[in-house]
Amino acid sequence: MRTFIKLILKILMFFISWIVLAILIPIPEGISDVWWRFTAELVPFLAIVILTYVFNRFEKDRLSIIHFEEPIKQTLTGMLLGLIWFYIPFLLLNSLGYFEITDRSQIHMLGIWVISAFINSIMQELLVRGYLYQLVKRKYNIWPASIVSTLLFTLMHGGAFEAGPIAVINVITMSILMTIILECSNSLVIPIIMHFIWNSLGGIIFGTVSLADDYPHLYNIEITGNPIISGGSFKMEGSIFVFIINIIMIGIAYYPVSY
């Protein structure tokens, strides 16, 4: 019981410290939208990096957080899995007429927007499956760690609750998938790359994934038809197709972990 209380206090201290740092570090005023978003993503990212380093320094045995064993292989694997993960439901919805590309927009400084999405992906994975995940896993095992990470990930995507049960289930299964990929690879690199591809392609290129409201998207897409299939207002992340793909990929990824 004492170990459990100590663990809960450490989790709360870490999470609250991250929120406080992210709020207290000011974002400059009077800058363009692209640089405002870049700074808004950079601040919580720096906060999580600093806290991860500081808290891990106080552990008797350092926790392995990212683990760059085969960075090139892991990056290429993450890119391949991320493309499969995104394009299968996207192409299905597009070919069946639920998504239709209507026109194309011009995005000023597209590269900075993409870098901002990358920073956001690293920040989320470090927060959800970094220090806290490894801490709970060491104290107990993978199952409590997975529950904690999934709860955090779901809370960070609270807009899903407004979109309906499928959107919530998709967020949960996405988190479970990323956790299994983490355990398969013993590294955060692949989940980070997959998360980034999902957000950059879905949020910035096609606009079928919900990011912060100020993120632009290159293509304008009209979403029509049954919201259970199309995703409705929550876009692709509210689609039953994404749930199916998540479950299939979870099953494939879980097999080597369980045996």
Regions flagged by a language model, labelled:
Residues 167-227:
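Functionally important transmembrane alpha-helices
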Residues 36-41, 144-179:
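Alpha-helical transmembrane segments and their immediate interhelical/interface regions
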Residues 1-62, 203-259:
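N-terminal, membrane-interfacial amphipathic/helix-forming hydrophobic leader that caps
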Residues 1-15, 35-46, 59-91, 105-110, ...:
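Interfacial transmembrane-helix boundary/kink motif in multi-pass membrane proteins
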Residues 17-32, 52-63, 89-96, 114-117, ...:
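Hydrophobic alpha-helical transmembrane segments
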Residues 15-23, 86-91, 150-158, 197-205, ...:
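Aromatic-anchored segments of alpha-helical transmembrane domains
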Residues 39-50, 110-115, 123, 127, ...:
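Membrane-embedded alpha-helical segments of multi-pass membrane proteins
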Residues 103-163:
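Function-critical hydrophobic alpha-helical transmembrane segments in multi-pass membrane proteins
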